[in-house]
Amino acid sequence: MQIYKVGGAVRDRLLGRPVSDVDWLVVGATVEQMQAQGFRPVGADFPVFLHPKTGEEYALARTERKSGRGYGGFTFHASPDVTLEEDLIRRDLTINAMAEDEHGDLHDPYHGKTDLDQRILRHVSLAFAEDPLRVLRVARFAARYAPMGFRVADETLELMRQISASGELLALTAERSWKEIERALMEDQPQVFIEVLRACGALKELMPEVDALFHGEVSQGSHALDVLQQAAAQQQPLAVRWACLLLALGGKQIKTVNQRFKAPRECQELAILVGEFHEQGHRAMELAPEMLLDLLQKFDVYRRPQRFEEFIEACRMDALLGGRDYPQSEYLRGAAATARAVDVKPLMESGLTGQALGGALKAARLSALQAYKAR
């Protein structure tokens, strides 16, 4: 039995990046041998075990062959006869197909270290094209390592084009696709993820609405990527970044994209609201008090102040591209605070209830906003 550290832990150590999760590969062992040593099986599709003390994942060496469509369309074979080289060749990129033994020696049959040094994301074998999820993974890695100068190898990009043209991307589940999108959006240069998807034709398959933004007389797509990059530079949360990407789409299109990937509820809601109201955000100080109150009501600022704050931030990301200050931020925050400060208690004590109470509260808030605007 030989045990190797594999994948991201080896790659990131060689890059001098922090290593968070460590994956281990076991060659020459059986399921029974692993269990006899106290390892707990957790893999439903292939033998993966948790270490009895550290809780880290240990997988038996395995091979795989294509048996159906999509990410899950594979048959796996794990046995003590599977070699280290046979296991590593099934991996996506050469930089992820390196292993380190117990002595710290590097095992690199597919020249991942060379590609690492040359800053190239290159597929290990032609089997790369059998898994459509790898298109999203490579685009995500391109975004992650863009600050270090990495690029996708031409021949790998060509394979990604073939996958995109095959229709296999449409076999991916919403959950798997969203997981990659979410992780990519939270990288330092998430716009690179979209650029790579567009370069290989995957954006047209997965998000035709966003892809179409690049084909008008004025490229709204380039603007969307600039806003997304700005949001990342300002370390905005996921919901704001998602809203920035979709900002230029119409409400119906945003809803369609949201549902296609089953985005989290907070991401869906913010994207729709930002798409509909960001122009009002930019014109905040020109809005009549009635429109300003209506905007606050739409966002339910009384119960969900954080969502309105994220709306303000998305608007600010859009405006910052012009190098301008954004006084609308403080103006909108002040308006929300003014409306929230209206005390409902005196109205209730006066005996108002139901619709009458609601109408009086709205009138009081409008009066407060009129005074706020007049300052």
Curated annotation (Swiss-Prot):
Q: Is Cell cycle one of the keywords UniProt gives this record? A: no
Provide the reaction this enzyme catalyses. a tRNA precursor + 2 CTP + ATP = a tRNA with a 3' CCA end + 3 diphosphate; a tRNA with a 3' CCA end + 2 CTP + ATP = a tRNA with a 3' CCACCA end + 3 diphosphate
Its required cofactor(s), as named, are: Mg(2+)
Task: Indicate which residues the UniProt annotation says bind Mg(2+).
Answer: 21, 23
Give the highest taxon in the source lineage: Bacteria
One Pfam family matching this protein:
PolyA_pol
> What Gene Ontology terms for biological process does this UniProt record contain?
RNA repair; tRNA 3'-terminal CCA addition
Name the UniProt key words of this record, in alphabetical order.
ATP-binding, Magnesium, Metal-binding, Nucleotide-binding, Nucleotidyltransferase, RNA repair, RNA-binding, Transferase, tRNA processing
State the Gene Ontology terms under molecular function.
ATP binding; CCA tRNA nucleotidyltransferase activity; magnesium ion binding; tRNA binding
Give its E.C. classification number. 2.7.7.72
Does this UniProt record's set of keywords contain Isomerase? no
Q: What does the entry list as the binding residues for ATP?
A: 8, 11, 91, 137, 140
Entry's HAMAP family?
CCA_bact_type2
Q: What else is known?
A: A single active site specifically recognizes both ATP and CTP and is responsible for their addition.
Task: Please give the function described in this protein's UniProt entry.
Answer: Catalyzes the addition and repair of the essential 3'-terminal CCA sequence in tRNAs without using a nucleic acid template. Adds these three nucleotides in the order of C, C, and A to the tRNA nucleotide-73, using CTP and ATP as substrates and producing inorganic pyrophosphate. tRNA 3'-terminal CCA addition is required both for tRNA processing and repair. Also involved in tRNA surveillance by mediating tandem CCA addition to generate a CCACCA at the 3' terminus of unstable tRNAs. While stable tRNAs receive only 3'-terminal CCA, unstable tRNAs are marked with CCACCA and rapidly degraded.
Q: What is this protein called?
A: CCA-adding enzyme
Organism field: Pseudomonas entomophila (strain L48)
Q: Gene name? A: cca
